[in-house]
Amino acid sequence: MPTIQQLVRKGRRDKIGKVKTAALKGSPQRRGVCTRVYTTTPKKPNSALRKVARVKLTSQVEVTAYIPGEGHNLQEHSMVLVRGGRVKDLPGVRYKIIRGSLDTQGVKNRKQARSRYGAKKEKS
């Protein structure tokens, strides 16, 4: 434990918390290029083939990003926009690809929560 004199001289240092989306370097989103598009299986009680992509960001960091929604048009060398947000049942996936921006198309026939999936309003 420090003495009062030591605290007067140095003071206390604040602890620096760990950032959950370090690869974004403080930005809300980052652009990147898909290096690999593949499917992976989730953690124990769940069962599916989740669509994910390895993305090399403009911050020179390569991350694994989830592709939300049903169906996608992504392939290698596609330009994508990546945001933070983990997928609970996929270990190591801490980023999501934004649908409807750059090379990523929106989800077809989406009626609800359209803005999250880049789907345009249907003409009635």
Curated annotation (Swiss-Prot):
Ranges for region Disordered: 105-124
Single GO biological process annotation from the record: translation
Stored InterPro entries: NA-bd_OB-fold (IPR012340), Ribosomal_uS12 (IPR006032), Ribosomal_uS12_bac (IPR005679)
Residues recorded as bearing 3-methylthioaspartic acid in the entry: 89
Keywords: Methylation, Ribonucleoprotein, Ribosomal protein, RNA-binding, rRNA-binding, tRNA-binding
Record has Nucleus as a keyword: no
Pfam families, sorted: Ribosom_S12_S23
GO molecular function, one term: tRNA binding
Comp. bias intervals (Basic residues): 108-118
KW rRNA-binding (keyword) present: yes
Gene Ontology annotations for the cellular component aspect, listed alphabetically: small ribosomal subunit
Subunit structure, as described in the record: Part of the 30S ribosomal subunit. Contacts proteins S8 and S17. May interact with IF1 in the 30S initiation complex.
Function: With S4 and S5 plays an important role in translational accuracy.
HAMAP family documented for this protein: Ribosomal_uS12_B
Family: Belongs to the universal ribosomal protein uS12 family.
Protein name, as recorded: Small ribosomal subunit protein uS12
Lineage: Bacteria, Bacillati, Actinomycetota, Actinomycetes, Mycobacteriales
